[in-house]
Amino acid sequence: MDSFIYSIWQALEIVLWFAVPIFLIALFWRLRLIHKRQQFLEKQEWDMLEVRIPSNIIKRPKAMEQVFSGIYGIYSFGNPWIPKYMEGKVDLWVSFEIAAKGGSIRFYVRTPKSFRNLVESSIYGQYPEAEILEAEDYVHELPSSLPNETFDIWGTGFKLANEAPYPIRTYKEFDEFEPDDEKRIDPMSALFEAMSKLQQNERIWIQCMVSATGKPTGYDIQEEMGKIIQDIQDKSKEADKEGKITRKPPTHGTQEIIKGIENKASKHLFQFTLRFLYIAPKE
């Protein structure tokens, strides 16, 4: 018995001699990579741009979709190995922001300085009447620590209810009800109405950060789409009395989901983070 335990202990010692160094090397490499990425991000210079579009300019939401198509040019299509793992280079993002204070609503784009020309040209391409100005960061109007004795804050982040390839309701669903530009439904109108009624020193900030993505950087929507469609089709299978497997015809709802997934897969892809913050003086 003692010799058996001793043999196990010797085997464990041999394994540990190999496993511990490998674990420590992997841990060191991971921590080093995190540190390098932090250094890379700290070196980036950012511009805050205020976008002003005349209120009498009528554009369909399709124009903004084209803006995003232009901004997809920020995509690296996969950084080379040395910049990615030795220098900590990561794909940067652009943030589209709405800031309301006391009933005044402003639109901003926060962009890395290296992407500024691309962002401006993408906006001007669809909104030639727009005015793009370099602006101060509105966040700096408030203390760096919130909540405090003067201000209270509430915030939340949003995420998709289903997996990313599933379709969501977009401007096209609103446009189809009323093709007339003057009468079409504006899905943002209720939000802007609420923001326009803020009291003095009340603030609402909405920030949507987008980073271009795709198969070269690890997200293959075609593969994900195939899995979901296969899962939907598998759920339509049923066995008859003889045990023979048959597939029920897809319902109209199922057909619309599959159509929406395929349409989404044909678009430029972005990873996104959506945040909402409400800040007000303490009563």
Which residue stretches match the model-derived regions?
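Extended, folded cores of ATP/NTP-driven motor/assembly subunits in large transport
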Residues: 2-283
